[in-house]
């Protein structure tokens, strides 16, 4: 890859050319890990992530290129957008796990995500039971029982996330791909549901405070 401005050969796809200082385009296929100079991994060093994000964001902040030519302004905006997305996603354990799964072909954020895998029957029954119980508490405006459910669901969410992370480590280390993908997918599907449940209880609390 060469710099679009001075044609210098670039190594490791820098955000700016070390020779002429011009902002470079986002490379085709760049991942959120690439944006922050990280290898795909379940764990990341958060202080390093924070430092790299701030350093690179300062280099390409669009305000610095208000008078630059249109091409460089566009590149600065693209780099900034990617950096912000990378920082927002990779600093969060669950979001990072979902993204790692997506990089390996399972995107649970898609509308048709449910059709990508068959969830265990026991989990589907659990979902129905939780839903019915929460609906009952909501109808009765019984906040304390809902909070008790939320505490239990929070523990289940944490356990499911740990299960997903174990499967993703196995996947990244070259383990049995199909089994690791299925295990991570099922665990993260539970994380997604439990997260929504907790958000609904939080909404109940906000409604109670507003009354």
Where on the chain are the PLM-derived regions?
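C-terminal accessory/regulatory regions appended to core domains
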Residues: 1-211
């Amino acid at each position: 890859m060469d710099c679009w401005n001075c044609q210098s050969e670039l190594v490791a796809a820098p955000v700016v050319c070390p020779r002429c200082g011009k902002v470079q385009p986002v490379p085709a296929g760049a991942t959120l890990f690439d944006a922050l100079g990280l290898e795909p991994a379940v764990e990341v060093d958060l202080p390093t992530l924070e430092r790299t994000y701030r350093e690179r964001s300062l280099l390409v902040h669009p305000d610095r290129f208000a008078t630059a030519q249109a091409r460089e302004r566009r590149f600065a905006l693209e780099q900034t957008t990617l950096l912000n997305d990378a920082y927002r996603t990779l600093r969060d354990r669950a979001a990072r796990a979902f993204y790692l799964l997506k990089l390996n072909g399972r995107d649970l954020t898609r509308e048709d995500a449910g059709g990508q895998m068959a969830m265990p029957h026991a989990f589907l029954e659990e979902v129905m039971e939780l839903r019915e119980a929460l609906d009952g508490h909501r109808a009765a405006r019984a906040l304390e029982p809902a909070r008790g459910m939320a505490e239990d669901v929070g523990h289940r969410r944490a356990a499911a996330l740990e299960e997903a992370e174990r499967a993703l480590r196995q996947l990244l280390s070259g383990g049995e791909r199909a089994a690791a993908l299925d295990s991570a997918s099922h665990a993260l599907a539970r994380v997604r549901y439990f997260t929504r449940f907790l958000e609904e209880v939080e909404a109940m609390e906000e409604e109670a405070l507003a009354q």
